[in-house]
């Protein structure tokens, strides 16, 4: 049984919305073509966070549902939808393990945007299988750096990730934390396709959608990116959070007086399993 820790992303919701790099600009077209999406049917986005995927994909469906256990993430998702003028999303505060009861189907597509690994994976995948309409799809979506060639630098210096992570370690120690405990181990075998293959879905398809080659971010966006991670969320720093932020800003100013950086989050990996 997965135990939910409500402090995992404490203070991170707004940073998650503004600090995470976007998935491939071709994601909607890829899913529409692969799954025959035509504006009908229902979408369920599990572990939706501040609605990054939910809001992007909602226009491909008649109705979308964003599900997340964190009320602050849900609130950010609502704001994001309102900002974009999207009115066909229902927001549900619940865990993936609460399915199907928390958000009954049927659904044409159920997505997990970098969230599947937080769940009781086999149990949740089997629940999703029952919730999908015939021919529906479970889709895992994530950034995948290193899966393809790195594009040429468009000009600004790259984000100095190693130096920022050294600052995180300086403040928080070498053992990564999440909420009130240790961060989950980094997956070493796959990104979930091995788990899905053990369920009724069988072996999924894996597709790479080209990432943004010329993504440029400013200092505050880079800092928000780090505050959006469970292992460097604001609450972990306690009363030293402003000192950490100041050091990161000083480091970034030294690397780029203009305050802009090139970010290459990688291509977008899509793991697609049909019912």
Language model segments and positions:
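Conserved class I S-adenosyl-L-methionine
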Residues: 1-38
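Class I SAM-dependent methyltransferase SAM/SAH-binding core
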Residues: 42-44, 50-98
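A short acidic, Gly/Pro-enriched loop at the edge of an enzyme's catalytic core
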Residues: 101-110
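Short catalytic micro-motifs in class I SAM-dependent methyltransferases
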Residues: 113-115
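A short, conserved alpha-helix within the catalytic core of class I
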Residues: 118-128
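Conserved catalytic/acceptor-binding region of the Class I
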Residues: 129-130, 135-213
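Conserved Class I S-adenosyl-L-methionine
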Residues: 185-275
